[in-house]
């Protein structure tokens, strides 16, 4: 269905560019009915887009898709309803978007980036990055893991940190008490 959706899109986009807006929308709505893929005729799509198992894919009017991108089923390239003018995302070349991901807003997803299945992307993604989660966060750039303040596996334990601090204070107090006992035995009193 992805190939057929793109064939219909190319025709509806041609109509759209030639100011036959009503016919362009008719063709795109017919394509949505036939393929389950909704591509607005105003969207700009480069060469080599692959829509795999396309059912449920939605591509908004001001979306721009570069060359050789891959989009899986259930992906939305949409707006948030807060913006005017350019409302939809721009995908640079060689971007892959996993099943069910939502990329919402007028920002850029950099070249060679990957968006994980089910991610909700609301902010810019740099080139050569991998973004995951809801809301999406970048976890890899250029194949290297990115440190995250919200790493749920290695997040600092505040109770453990407090216990360590208290142990340190106890050790310091024990040293001071020992020093006081030593000084008292010698008959000297020293201010600490």
Where are these regions (language model features)?
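Short Gly/charged-rich anion-binding patches and loops
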Residues: 26, 64, 165
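A transmembrane-helix-recognition feature enriched in membrane-embedded lipid enzymes
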Residues: 1-35
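Structural signal for interior beta-strand "rungs" in well-ordered beta-sheet cores
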Residues: 32-139
């Amino acid at each position: 269905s992805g190939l057929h959706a793109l064939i219909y899109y190319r025709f509806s986009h041609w109509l759209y560019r030639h100011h036959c807006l009503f016919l362009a929308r008719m063709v795109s709505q017919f394509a949505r009915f036939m393929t389950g893929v909704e591509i607005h005729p105003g969207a700009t799509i480069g060469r080599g887009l692959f829509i795999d198992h396309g059912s449920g894919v939605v591509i908004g009017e001001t979306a721009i898709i570069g060359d050789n991108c891959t989009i899986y089923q259930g992906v939305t390239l949409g707006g948030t309803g807060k913006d005017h003018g350019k409302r939809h995302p721009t995908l640079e070349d060689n971007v892959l978007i996993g099943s069910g991901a939502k990329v919402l807003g007028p920002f850029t997803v950099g070249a060679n980036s990957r968006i994980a299945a089910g991610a909700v992307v609301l902010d810019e993604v740099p080139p050569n990055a991998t973004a995951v989660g809801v809301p999406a966060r970048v976890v890899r750039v250029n194949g290297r893991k990115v440190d995250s303040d919200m790493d749920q596996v290695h997040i600092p334990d505040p109770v453990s940190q407090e216990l360590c601090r208290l142990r340190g204070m106890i050790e310091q107090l024990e040293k001071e008490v020992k020093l006081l006992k030593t000084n008292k035995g010698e008959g000297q009193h020293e201010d600490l």
